[in-house]
Amino acid sequence: MMIKQYLQVTKPGIIFGNLISVVGGFLLASKGVIDYPLFLATLFGVSLVVASGCVFNNYIDRDIDRIMERTKNRVLVKGLIDPKVSLIYASILGIAGMLLLYVGANPLAMWLAVIGFVIYVGVYSLYMKRKSVYGTLIGSLSGAAPPVIGYCAVTGQFDMGALILLLIFSLWQMPHSYAIAIFRFKDYQAANIPVLPVIKGISVTKNHITLYILAFMVATLMLTLSGYAGYKYLVVAAAVSVWWLGMALRGYKATNDSVWARKLFVFSIIAITSLSVMMSVDFNVPSSAGLLTYVG
């Protein structure tokens, strides 16, 4: 029973979601030549670091998790794991993950994990989430770290491809997170968390969602235009972005914002999964390096 609780506190769903993006970044950089020991070290290393961040987040958020309907049954809220033990557990997971990335991948992969971890736990969870409407923006940087780690584990350098991945996944996080904040509006309001819908209103949030999806659309296309992904990826990226944008625009006429936001949220997961899969398999670019100058 205790094993189940120690697993739950790491938020397995979040770990799995992040692993899909790690695979996308890793295989994009591998170009069909897969180093399997490196692949496994990267997957397990990132999994451990993400798990650590989630446990620390659960520890930090115990007070607000009690208030929110969605989180009131979390392991630490119900006292199923001693808070002090959870801190030790989180520390062990984090150190193990970072060591694995350092030894099994490369120092750059480890440092990117450290930066993502510090932003998520230190900047976002401890401060920005509770104090600023810009918390979501800061948190998006840590959410974009896994695919960049996967990519840099292979390349050993932070090039234009890594930067484009950072942009794609950071920009994706914003509409994804704002959608959650809309359909969980009452929870965030009750817990006094200053997310955009609560502070500025849902109408303003819809404008932000639309703008971020437009920016996301441009960023996704850059992966092909800069010579990193193929044209099959480009077609899927364009189709997914246009559909997501259409869903966002329909939000202006929505009679039930909660239902609309939930649909937008669900599609955001489909969208990013589709892109991760396509960049994994469509890494060959026909003849020329791309429509824009290749940097790598």
Swiss-Prot record:
It is an enzyme of class 2 (transferase). The chain crosses the membrane at residues 14-34, 36-56, 75-95, 99-119, 133-153, 163-183, 209-229, 234-254, 265-285. InterPro entries: Protohaem_IX_farnesylTrfase, UbiA_prenyltransferase, UbiA_prenylTrfase_CS, UbiA_sf. It catalyses: heme b + (2E,6E)-farnesyl diphosphate + H2O = Fe(II)-heme o + diphosphate. GO terms for cellular component: plasma membrane. One of its GO terms (molecular function) is protoheme IX farnesyltransferase activity. Keywords: Cell inner membrane, Cell membrane, Heme biosynthesis, Membrane, Transferase, Transmembrane, Transmembrane helix. Pathway: Porphyrin-containing compound metabolism; heme O biosynthesis; heme O from protoheme: step 1/1. Its EC number is 2.5.1.141. It is found in: Cell inner membrane. It is a multi-pass membrane protein. Its main location: membrane. GO terms for biological process: heme O biosynthetic process. It comes from the Bacteria. Carbon 2 of the heme B porphyrin ring is defined according to the Fischer nomenclature. Converts heme B (protoheme IX) to heme O by substitution of the vinyl group on carbon 2 of heme B porphyrin ring with a hydroxyethyl farnesyl side group. Belongs to the UbiA prenyltransferase family. Protoheme IX farnesyltransferase subfamily. NCBIfam families: cyoE_ctaB, PRK04375.1-1. This is Protoheme IX farnesyltransferase. The lineage of its organism: Bacteria, Pseudomonadati, Pseudomonadota, Gammaproteobacteria, Enterobacterales.
